[in-house]
Amino acid sequence: YNSFELIRLIGILSKRDMCIMAYYDFVKEYMKVDECKNNKKYSSAGHTFCWNKEDSTYAEGLYWFYEGDGFIIDIHDFYVKEEIVQNNTHSMADYVSIYSSYIVSANGEKFNPYQTLTPNSLCTFDFDNIKDDFVFLLHENCCYLAVSIGFKKELIEKHLASININPESFYSSLLQPNQIILTKSLEKVALEILNCKMDAPAADFFFK
């Protein structure tokens, strides 16, 4: 590159990075509501966004999240009034690569690959390699309660390198359905997150 090409490239990359909004703003734009700062159901160290009857025709409840350095923990806590069919991931790859959900309560299905979404099950997404025919379906008149942990790839691979584990074999194992041992491990973590009522900075220490 000559100096002019380099300056132009830096400008393009800077504009691209500026286009990726903060996760808080991403959630706010997607849900089309302001943060429910008075809702104390989950830890105040995170952020809670609520859907009431007038905000959505198909679901009512709340979404809570805590964002750390390289990871996001979130809780979906909704009553599904009408069948929900989700066929895209709304650019989640901008924020996390691997996203595992421990499902406390649900009645639905995930397609391509197929998996039933039922209580006490684990559902993992690789947002960097999600397929175009991805479909996520929740049936009407059901409660959807799930605790999820999403990691950026850089954080995962840094940790894998430190313990000498091959990333490809790790991802291959992680994305297999019906992992009883991993599901049981995440069940304990999920219940602790659901029951955490700590404020910052104690909650920051707990979530990290």
Report residues per predicted region.
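Mixed-charge, polar/low-complexity N-terminal
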Residues: G46-T48, K53-E54, A59-G61, I103, ...
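Beta-strand elements of well-folded, non-transmembrane domains
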Residues: V80-E82, Y102-A106, K153
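Alpha-helical bundle regulatory/interaction domains
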Residues: E109-K208
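Short hydrophobic beta-strand segments that form the core of ligand-binding sensory/regulatory domains
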Residues: D74-D77, S97-S101, L145-K152
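Short acidic/polar alpha-helix capping motifs at helix-coil junctions
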Residues: A22-K28, F49-W51, S97-S101, N120-L122, ...
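A sequence-composition feature that detects small, non-aromatic residues
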Residues: A22, V27, A45, A59, ...
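Glycine- and acidic-residue-biased ligand/ion/polar-headgroup-sensing regions
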Residues: M92-P113
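N-terminal low-complexity or simple alpha-helical regulatory segments
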Residues: N2-D94
